[in-house]
């Protein structure tokens, strides 16, 4: 079975637009000032407005971006406008449409929160600034690609310095330790738990990101050969590679919450089901999620996090600058600030956001390292050592293919 990835769909979209629109002459070229040192970029950025397109579905993330905007205005004279997205793919499509229409400068998006499938689509369609700009940021020196390879490899796609790392994420499971003292720690054990406890487990409905990530987690644990998952889906026998996943789901679905006839819309909805005692296990893609929910009174303080014995999916999310950004200098300054120890420390604080840092502690000054070491971890947050066993994300093309097949098989209530 063959699937069209987002990259292929965008190619088709571009062809359609190019056929329909006579390419105009490029807009008046933006005078880009990067210079031999970053001070030149900072000076050129003053007075610019950065239209930062980023998911807007979480108040604590929105508040963090607002804080960053205040700091950037005070320090650099940069205005940061948060354009709140429901789907990053829509922003990618807009950039592609601008390219097809000949808008090679003065684009509507200056900075984009991105990773995985969307980054791969932008890279394939030449929608990114491509001068390895991220590696030239002053704050890049605080990272270590040997310790965290995912900053150079986004869902198996080399980043080539075309996006700047912003934060880390890892799939975690949560359980109420009073109701479920010993949670299942593998796909096989989870299948047995579901069989023995009908109605006590579910997962967010794909295409929710956490729901799709759960499907990938089960596939990685059950597949007889995971190597094809790290190559484009079109190069593989999709039916054969994914058969263990569909077998697992077929066995489990009738014993899910509501008999597998309905699913929580997203992971916050699943978290609420856990808090209300309707299910015994939650899922999130932020190790600090449960602790933050306990602090907000959304979960009881008996909830704890865990991962599977063989590890769980982990990835890095990034900031990218489109090829036609209207304020490329200011976008680089914003990306550098977001990567700085100060901004990363605030972002990692579970009372603020709780998004794990991409910085390498051994690369930091002692006072900055001490700040990270002093962060409250939260009673439900696993330590770095407990999170050390991870699974690499499959090639991004698998995400849509798996989601489409899930919808065909189970999207109408199993």
Question: What is each residue range found by the language model?
Answer:
Residues 55-67, 82-92, 105, 109-268:
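Extracytoplasmic ligand-binding site segments that recognize negatively charged/polar headgroups
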Residues 34-36, 272, 379-414:
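Conserved C-terminal helix/tail region of periplasmic/extracytoplasmic solute-binding proteins
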Residues 2-17:
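Bacterial N-terminal signal peptides that target proteins for export
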Residues 14-26:
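Bacterial N-terminal signal peptides
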Residues 312, 317-386:
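Mature extracytoplasmic/periplasmic domains
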Residues 119-121, 282-300:
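A ligand-binding cleft/hinge motif common to bilobed small-molecule-binding domains
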Residues 37-46, 53, 57-79, 173:
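Short, polar/charged alpha-helical segment
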Residues 155-156, 169, 248-253, 263, ...:
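Periplasmic-binding protein-like
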């Amino acid at each position: 079975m063959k699937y069209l990835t987002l990259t292929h769909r965008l190619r088709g979209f571009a062809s359609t637009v190019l056929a329909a629109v006579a390419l105009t002459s490029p807009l008046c070229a933006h005078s880009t000032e990067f210079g031999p040192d970053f001070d030149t970029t900072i000076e050129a950025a003053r007075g610019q407005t950065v239209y930062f397109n980023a998911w807007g579905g979480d108040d604590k993330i929105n508040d963090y971006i607002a804080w960053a905007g205040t700091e950037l205005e005070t320090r650099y004279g940069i205005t940061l406008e948060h354009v709140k997205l429901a789907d990053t793919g829509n922003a990618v499509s807009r950039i592609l449409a601008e390219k097809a229409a000949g808008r090679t400068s003065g684009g509507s998006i200056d900075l984009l929160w991105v990773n995985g499938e969307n980054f791969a689509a932008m890279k394939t369609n030449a929608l990114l600034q491509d001068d390895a700009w991220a590696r030239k940021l002053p704050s890049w020196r605080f990272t270590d690609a040997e310790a965290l390879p995912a900053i150079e490899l986004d869902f198996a796609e080399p980043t080539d310095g075309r996006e700047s790392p912003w934060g880390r994420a890892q799939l975690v499971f949560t359980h109420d330790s009073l109701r479920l003292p010993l949670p299942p720690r593998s796909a096989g054990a989870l299948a047995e738990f579901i069989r023995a406890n009908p109605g006590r487990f579910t997962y967010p409905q794909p295409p929710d990101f956490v729901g799709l990530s759960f499907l990938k987690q089960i596939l990685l644990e059950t597949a007889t050969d995971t190597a094809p998952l790290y190559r484009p889906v079109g190069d593989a026998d999709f039916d054969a590679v994914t058969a263990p996943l569909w077998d697992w789901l077929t066995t489990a679905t009738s014993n899910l919450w509501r008999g597998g006839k309905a699913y929580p819309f997203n992971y916050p909805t699943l978290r609420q089901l856990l808090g209300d005692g309707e299910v015994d296990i939650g899922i999130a893609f932020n190790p600090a999620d449960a602790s933050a929910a306990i602090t907000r009174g959304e979960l009881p303080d008996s909830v704890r996090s865990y991962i599977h014995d063989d590890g769980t999916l982990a990835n890095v999310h990034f900031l990218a600058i489109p090829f036609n950004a209207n304020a490329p200098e200011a976008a680089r300054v914003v990306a550098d600030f977001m990567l700085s120890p100060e901004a990363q420390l605030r972002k990692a604080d579970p009372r603020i956001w709780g998004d794990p840092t991409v910085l390498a502690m051994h690369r930091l000054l002692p006072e900055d390292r001490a700040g990270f070491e002093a962060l409250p971890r939260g009673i439900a947050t696993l330590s770095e050592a407990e999170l050390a066993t991870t699974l690499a994300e499959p090639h991004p093309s698998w995400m849509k293919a798996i989601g489409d097949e899930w919808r065909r098989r189970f999207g109408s209530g199993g």
